[in-house]
């Protein structure tokens, strides 16, 4: 792998770790008590527990992958990185979507199922969730770039396919 690409790959993987840790910390410590409606915390909402779980998986994988890039025997396992990066990126997409939907409903409610918006009563909680979602979305962007890098590394090992025109010209000679 080119040194610049390896440095970018490592930097992104290392950057994902504190972003994921911050997402987890902001989500887990986020709670607000309301005298009318009671205490709201992340563990009351399944989608936020999912986001915390995916963030923990993401940070753990990023750490292992960042270390593995510098170990010679694992550098040649480009397909392992490619598949793993794709899986993590897709898991991140699902958790960002779930958290975004929760935040949307918290701000706007859903009149059809008689859910009222909650952010007027739990403004601090909603602001904390918004910050956590922004960090989680940034982590997703990093993993999309990592997925592209690992795809490039995996598929650049092969020659491009020969076009039918080149095949016909080769047969004529």
UniProtKB/Swiss-Prot annotation:
Instruction: Please name the source species.
Output: Ricinus communis (Castor bean)
Instruction: Point out the coiled-coil segments of this chain.
Output: none
The answer to whether UniProt assigns keyword Cell membrane to this entry is yes
Where is it found, in Gene Ontology cellular component terms? plasma membrane
- Which residue ranges does the entry give as Cytoplasmic-facing topology? 1-9, 72-86, 153-173
Q: Glycosylation positions? A: 34
Instruction: Name one matching Pfam family.
Output: CASP_dom
Give the family from UniProt: Belongs to the Casparian strip membrane proteins (CASP) family.
Name its cellular compartments.
Answer: Cell membrane
Quaternary structure, per UniProt, is:
Homodimer and heterodimers.
Annotated membrane-spanning segments are 10-29, 51-71, 87-107, 132-152
Name listed for the protein in its UniProt record: CASP-like protein 2D1
Where is this protein chiefly located?
Answer: membrane
